[in-house]
């Protein structure tokens, strides 16, 4: 029987070799080489982190914060580089979701 850690490492390498993973890397590099896209990306990450912290503490974003997030979403949608990045992330997430179901199936059997 193969070592479970060896199999996990093999899975990691297989994910990195997926064309969808490579497409996300390419899209990320494009964002990093464009100043406008990079600023929007950093704003998105900061906003996402702020909202997650609020929700974890049981708070909801104010109307003003929701409006800011909506405006940021519109800016992101209008930036071709970020749009491509999120589209590629979505394609990759399909694989990751399927893999997660497979890997966690034994745990479901125990519940």
From Swiss-Prot:
Gene3D superfamilies the UniProt entry points to: YheA/YmcA-like
Superkingdom of source: Bacteria
A family per Pfam: Com_YlbF
InterPro entries named among the record's database cross-references: Com_YlbF, YheA/YmcA-like_dom_sf
Intrachain S-S bonds: none
NCBIfam families referenced in this protein's UniProt entry, alphabetically: PRK13676.1-1
Family statement: Belongs to the UPF0342 family.
Protein name stated in the entry: UPF0342 protein SAK_1409
UniProt organism field: Streptococcus agalactiae serotype Ia (strain ATCC 27591 / A909 / CDC SS700)
